[in-house]
Amino acid sequence: KSRTRFQAVITNCRTGEAEYPDVKDFRTDTVYIRASSSLPFLSKMVKINGELYLDGGVSDSIPIKKSIENGNTKNIIIMTRDKKYRKKQSKLGKISAIRYKKYPKFVELMNTRFSRYNEILEYIYELERQGKVFIIQPETPLNLGRIEKNKEKLTNVYNIGYKEAEKRYSAMMEYL
C-alpha cells in the first residue's frame, strides 16, 4: 500500500468552490475521479453526498497552491500547453448561463476561467524562476483537441511528452 497521498480536484457546482477529496481506494473512490474528469457541456454532473460536481479544472486549473498548502516543497507540474499559450475568453458565456442557470456561481467560474488560468500561469512561471517548482511542458503547441480520439495524434503527443521528460530528466532529478 502506497503512502503517497492522492487528491482529486472537483468543482462544486452550487458553491463554485474547488474541493480536494482524498482518493484512498481506486475501487471505492472512483466517483471523485469521475467528477474530476467530467467536462462541462460534455459530461453529466456527478452527484456526491447530495452535491453536484464537475471537472476541477474549472475552479482550480493548476492546483499548485493547494499542493504547497499541503506541505509539498518539491512540485513537478506537467503541462499540456507550451509556455506562450494563454487562455482566451470563452465564447460559451451565454450558453453557460443557460445550461447551468441553476448554478450562478458555477457560471461565474466558467466566465472568469480564462483570467484565473492566465494568472496561475504567471504564478507558476514565477515559482519556476525562483526554483520552487519544476515544469515540464511542450516547446511548441501540440495541436490536439480536448477530447481527441485520433490514435495516431494521441500516440504522437505521447511520444512528444516522453521525449520532453527524457530531455528534462537530469534537471528534474537535480531539482528533487
What are these regions (language model features)?
Residues 1-176:
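Patatin-like phospholipase
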